[in-house]
Amino acid sequence: MKKILCMLMPYGGHFYPNLELLRLFVQRGAQVVVYCDAKYQECFPEGDIQVRDYPTAIREYCGHMASAQTDRKRAAREYFSYMADARIYALMQIEDLTMNRMMVEALGAEVADLNPDVFFCDAQASFLAQLREQIDCPQFELNASTFVPALWRSQRFQQYYQEILWTSYPDSISFDQILSLQRKRARRDKRPPDRSFGYLSPLLQDEAERLPATDQMLGFHLELHPQAQRAGVYVSRGTVCESYGAFLLEETVQALAPCGESIHVSWGGNPYSKQVLTQADFPENVHLHAYVNQIKMLENSKVFVTHGGITGVREALFAHTPMVVIPANFPDYQVGQAIEAHHAGILIRNRPLDAEEIREGYVELNRYYEDYQAGAAAMAAELESYWNAYGAELVWKACELA
């Protein structure tokens, strides 16, 4: 019996993509322990998988919310400072090292007692680096997002810096300084994973040719029911709580409101977005929601306006719903590039946001709607094809060989 230990980020967007994989492990007779958020234990009512909480300090670190901002420039500064402000970057590295030490102290002995045959970690869980050095078994990454090439190897990152980061935050450190900091951080990773598995396929992965050979695309599978008769626009920027995204969401809705279509906006439980949206003056065709059934909304909406988060994008592709992508961070910008390149939507590039550019993108989607819908369907078909060819079975084969 294989003993498998998984350590995931404690968010739904990082847990649910791995659900089918975790169930396959159990079906193949593995003993599975998952560190994430214990509330997901309900997904395994028979108790055949243990889902455990991280220490409180780690959960708080992962769930950190940015402070509320009323000034748009200050909100942008806070959002981009993790990458573009050398002082903030240094402070975040210190905090990250503190969390790494805490993980070793809190769970080092527990993990040693588990003595796993195979270890899986979330690709975004930087607080696991020191603990991973103590785990003496094959290690694999599970990537719920898109693969990001080393920034100094990426041609796309320079475009992102010029189009999004610098224009949103002109006080940013230089492009070369950012690359220098990223190289320095990469040298700290003393135990790279043996392989990294992502729920992607080539059409959805920007700069695939710049990824290491150890990055493996698994594809993805969803059972959705795209509706033939569609109407309206669905707008969301996910559930992350920060003010910069709240302002982008409000500006996006203001730009689209004159189109006359019914516009449904989800603020995803983000209190900052709720405050900004409920104080805004929108016409009657704009409908605000804390949460929605996103699958149903995507199946019935004509257009999805998104920040480019991979979970919502995959759902939109399987719903055959074309997208307008308005990214903030680099992975979402990559997703937007892939969506636009394969004719499943349009990427909005100008910052500050240009209402006319957003409206023109929306008009463009509607003018050639069948073509864009076909592009989304083609990307979904490739994801499905890759899942059937590789998918969870490929990961299990890696476990068997470990």
Name the predicted role of every residue range.
Residues 6-19, 241-245:
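A short, glycine/small-residue-rich beta-strand->loop->alpha-helix junction that serves as a flexible
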Residues 2-3, 30-33, 37-261, 397, ...:
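Nucleotide-sugar-dependent glycosyltransferase catalytic domains
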